[in-house]
């Protein structure tokens, strides 16, 4: 019974998708410098947790997947113009609730600071008078803009195009801390190894949820994707993909 129900749900999803996206291509907009959610691997291929989920959703909907790298600060223009169908790349719902048609939240996240281990900084309050770097138009930048007391205590708040640059600046001593998503921070620290960096977890800047952003009003495609993600949660696919990238299940869809 559950199998036939899932099959019926999948068929309905495909019908909805065909109605809303005639070319049969599922175009995913993402920041290609945002590992582990979406990035370019050592072989020059697009990969990442979110991109792997998106590919499986497209497959189940009978659509062709297309990965479309975008400038993160141009994401709204990209989706409004129809260049992409979704923004799926560690995309925070919090603070953007009315800007897009949203999927169900599929992950929880926090905004935190990363510092060099040898900096001597162990608490957020010790960032007073320090240089802090954050990605332009990111959730971290928005969270700091809303916490003026904290951001005004810094000597300088610098914006950068991507987090690879931010980590280079941190390593060279050009900045004292980087504000970023804890999910991404954990991956970066594991990848870079050697215990060179630490996450300041005593006082998160903000707590938030990740979702998939669709053009406002595109509820048919949103509903098809949501139904497919519920399917993937039920059959264990979300869990297995999550464990591949994070060694644990970080997803929240039931």
Label the predicted regions.
Residues 52-60, 131, 136-138, 211-248:
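Extended ligand-binding regions for polar small-molecule ligands
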Residues 32-35, 46-59, 91, 112-164, ...:
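Bilobed "Venus flytrap"/periplasmic-binding protein-like clamshell domains
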Residues 51, 66-77, 157-172, 208:
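Short helix-initiation/N-cap motifs at beta->coil->alpha
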């Amino acid at each position: 019974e559950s199998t036939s129900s899932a099959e019926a749900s999948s068929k309905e999803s495909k019908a909805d998708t065909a109605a809303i996206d005639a070319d049969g291509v599922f175009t995913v907009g993402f920041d290609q410098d945002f590992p582990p959610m979406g990035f370019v691997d050592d072989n020059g291929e697009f990969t990442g947790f979110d991109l792997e989920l998106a590919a499986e959703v497209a497959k189940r909907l009978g659509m062709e997947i297309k990965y479309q790298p975008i400038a993160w600060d141009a994401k709204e223009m990209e989706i409004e113009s129809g260049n992409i169908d979704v923004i799926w790349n560690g995309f925070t719902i919090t603070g953007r609730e009315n800007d897009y048609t949203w999927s169900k939240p599929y992950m929880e996240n926090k905004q935190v600071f990363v510092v060099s281990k040898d900096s001597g900084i162990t608490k957020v309050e010790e960032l007073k008078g320090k240089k802090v770097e954050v990605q332009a138009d990111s959730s971290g930048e928005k969270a700091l803009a809303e916490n003026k007391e904290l951001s005004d205590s810094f000597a300088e708040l610098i914006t950068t195009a991507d987090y690879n640059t931010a980590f280079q600046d941190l390593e060279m001593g050009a900045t004292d801390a980087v504000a970023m998503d804890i999910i991404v921070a954990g991956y970066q620290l594991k990848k870079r190894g050697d215990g060179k960096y630490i996450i300041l977890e005593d006082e998160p800047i903000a707590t938030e949820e990740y979702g998939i952003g669709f053009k406002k009003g595109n509820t048919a495609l949103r509903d098809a994707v949501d139904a497919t993600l519920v399917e993937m949660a039920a059959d264990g696919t979300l869990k297995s993909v999550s464990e591949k990238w994070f060694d644990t299940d970080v997803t929240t869809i039931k």
